[in-house]
């Protein structure tokens, strides 16, 4: 390309987003569309130098996180990329040709039709017809409305190639055989190229997302044969997942306010609204093999993403509804998932473990705080019991009256310990304590509460918890000069360091176990700090667990106070008195003055909850669970 050609402007509009279709003068103002989004805009003027380099152009487009679908249709590939791309093996997972990225690993998701080869190429022109890709009964149009994120133009999700922030998603949907349309072939240096694939089977998802980002963990979804119910919902659920995760990431990372907050809220709400319109996951007999388990896994992941969004937005009732929907899928398809667990790929198994464990964690803690019984209690019990047995925990005799529990190989050993830092055996005891609290609430409402039955059931759970405390305490390495104190000063003589890999999770589990004891005494006696059993359990928790946690914080080990340890902190701190309160004030102060890894908003919420409980007299103590429900601060406990 000659210099004169490079300097000549060949197209109109903003060089960054290409949405404004008008003649532009050199040195003109930035594009209103880019300015509204806070994106650095190249503005109007002569053709920038970087437009002449294909690789740098694509890099710039990814950095700007925007690509318009208006005025031209984006292709899945250029003709050169299609010719150079090798044909993948039948049924193989494939990835996109978009290579370099300013953010590391990207994601490529493809839905191929039966026997549809070749490339759908870019068409240039002045027409304003949006590009649409039909997928079953659903249609998506990339025609973003001014002033709104291109993902959220209307209820039909706009599939822009680089609109995701902060992750890059190259989304490409080919038409199904019934709606396939041949595209003419052309190439352009003005738009990114995508590697063309020829899929001779069924829809395939092959994401490559940063595994260290929780909401980015996304399962590989195996092919689902055509003609079966729910096939159309797979791409819909996938796109919805990306939108919800997008909004959640923005919410967690940016903590937006004002207009930005409204845009983030609108994005998450639209994604959830679209997900609610998806056909339900098919029943187990209708799908066979790996496709069924992967399909169910995708929906469980979507419901978890939706519940996480509701946690952030503060709508706890809808959060509980989304959790119940995911739990219902596990409950309905548990047999199928267990029977086909060995067929899942390694990534699918990791995704199944990740989302199932987080779902159980959130549901159990939410049920404990709201004094309710989880909808999928028996599934949770089997999974937690299996995890407990895999780590050599005590045999649990629970208070459930719905039947005996059995183990299941659905999750790998030590999954709860690895993903939450708390053992499944301890979480199982918390589930039993939550069920007991809900039972007492129901009995009191009906006027038939039996104190003898209440104490008897509490004693059974307490015996199990005491056994777990003894087992966990035996795992902590101690030196001969062991010391302990309930006054708040960390005890010394314990070996904590890199050579002791189990100490961190063991201390976390021990903190939870002591908190469960305190919660049990509160269920039986009420939220009264003057009850001897409550005071003794808090003193034990400080001397044998919380002091160890403070030692770990001094050494830079362990997790912060927020989220993971928020529940046991509220249980113990809200009922503390005298010198015990100084210990928990010191814990809050240490977290606030830590290394900056803690979320200041979460810590302040914990502090507010506890201070409200301390503001009342000891004879008429305030229940921290009532404070949380009244202030709608459930999000501080959930992950």
Swiss-Prot record:
Region called Disordered, residue ranges: 58-136, 476-499
InterPro entries: Fun_TF, Zn2-C6_fun-type_DNA-bd_sf, Zn2Cys6_DnaBD
An annotated GO cellular component: nucleus
Compartment(s) where it occurs, according to its Swiss-Prot or TrEMBL record: Nucleus
Keywords: DNA-binding, Metal-binding, Nucleus, Transcription, Transcription regulation, Virulence, Zinc
Pfam families xrefs: Fungal_trans_2, Zn_clus
Location of the DNA-binding region in this protein: 14-41
Coiled-coil regions listed: none
Domain of life, source organism: Eukaryota
GO molecular function terms listed in the Swiss-Prot or TrEMBL record: DNA binding; DNA-binding transcription factor activity, RNA polymerase II-specific; zinc ion binding
Chain intervals with Low complexity compositional bias: 68-108
Known role: Transcription factor; part of the gene cluster that mediates the biosynthesis of the phomopsins, a group of hexapeptide mycotoxins which infects lupins and causes lupinosis disease in livestock. May play a role in the regulation of the production of phomopsins.
Protein name: Transcription factor phomR'
Species: Diaporthe leptostromiformis
């Amino acid at each position: 390309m000659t210099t004169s050609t490079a300097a000549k402007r060949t197209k109109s509009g903003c060089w960054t987003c290409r949405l404004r279709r008008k003649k532009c003068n050199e040195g003109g103002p930035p594009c209103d569309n880019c300015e509204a989004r806070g994106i650095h805009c190249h503005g109007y003027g002569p053709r920038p130098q970087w437009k002449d380099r294909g690789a740098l152009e694509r890099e710039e487009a990814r950095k700007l996180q925007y690509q318009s679908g208006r005025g031209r249709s984006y292709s899945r590939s250029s003709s050169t990329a299609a010719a150079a791309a090798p044909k993948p093996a039948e049924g193989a997972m494939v990835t996109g040709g978009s290579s370099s990225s300013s953010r590391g690993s990207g994601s490529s998701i493809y839905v191929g039709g039966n026997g549809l080869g070749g490339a759908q190429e870019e068409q240039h022109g002045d027409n304003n017809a949006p590009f649409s890709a039909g997928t079953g009964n659903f249609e998506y149009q990339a025609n973003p409305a001014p002033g709104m994120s291109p993902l959220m133009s209307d209820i039909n999700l706009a599939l822009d190639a680089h609109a995701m922030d902060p992750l890059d998603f190259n989304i490409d949907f080919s038409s199904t055989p019934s709606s396939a349309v041949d595209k003419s072939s052309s190439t352009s240096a003005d738009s990114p190229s995508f590697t063309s694939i020829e899929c001779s089977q069924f829809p395939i998802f092959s994401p490559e997302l940063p595994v260290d980002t929780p909401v980015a963990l996304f399962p590989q979804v195996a092919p689902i044969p055509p003609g079966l119910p729910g096939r159309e919902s797979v791409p819909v659920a996938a796109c919805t997942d990306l939108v919800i995760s997008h909004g959640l990431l923005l919410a967690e990372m940016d903590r937006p306010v004002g207009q930005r907050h409204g845009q983030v809220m609108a994005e998450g709400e639209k994604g959830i609204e679209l997900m609610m319109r998806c056909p339900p996951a098919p029943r187990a007999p209708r799908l066979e093999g790996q496709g069924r388990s992967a399909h169910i896994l995708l929906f469980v992941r979507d419901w978890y993403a939706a519940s996480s969004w509701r946690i952030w937005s503060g709508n706890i009732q809808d959060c509980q509804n989304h959790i119940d929907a995911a739990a219902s899928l596990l409950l309905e398809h548990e047999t199928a998932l267990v029977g086909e667990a060995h067929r899942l790929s390694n990534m699918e198994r990791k995704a199944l473990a990740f989302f199932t464990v987080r779902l159980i964690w959130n549901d159990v803690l939410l049920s404990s705080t709201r004094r309710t019984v989880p909808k999928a209690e028996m599934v949770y019990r089997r999974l937690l019991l299996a995890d407990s047995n895999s780590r050599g925990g005590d045999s649990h005799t629970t208070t459930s009256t719905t039947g005996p529990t059995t183990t299941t190989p659905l999750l790998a050993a030590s999954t709860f310990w690895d993903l939450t830092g708390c053992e499944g055996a301890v979480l199982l005891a918390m589930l039993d304590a939550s069920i007991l609290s809900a039972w007492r609430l129901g009995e009191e409402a009906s006027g038939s509460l039996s104190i003898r039955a209440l104490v008897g059931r509490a004693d059974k759970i307490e015996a199990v918890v005491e056994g777990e405390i003894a087992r966990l305490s035996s795992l902590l390495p101690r030196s001969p000069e062991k010391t302990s104190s309930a006054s708040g000063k960390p005890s010394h003589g314990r070996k904590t360091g890199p050579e002791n890999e189990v100490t961190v999770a063991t201390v976390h589990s021990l903190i939870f176990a002591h908190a469960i004891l305190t919660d049990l005494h509160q269920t039986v006696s009420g939220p009264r700090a003057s009850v001897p059993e409550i005071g003794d359990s808090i003193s034990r928790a400080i001397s044998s667990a919380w002091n160890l946690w403070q030692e770990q914080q001094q050494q830079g080990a362990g997790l912060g106070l927020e989220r993971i340890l928020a529940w046991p902190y509220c249980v113990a701190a809200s009922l503390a008195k005298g010198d015990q309160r100084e210990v928990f004030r010191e814990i809050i102060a240490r977290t606030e003055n830590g290394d900056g890894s803690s979320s200041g908003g979460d810590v302040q919420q914990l502090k507010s909850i506890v201070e409200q409980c301390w503001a009342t007299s000891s004879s008429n103590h305030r229940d921290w669970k009532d404070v949380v429900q009244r202030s709608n601060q459930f999000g501080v406990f959930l992950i």
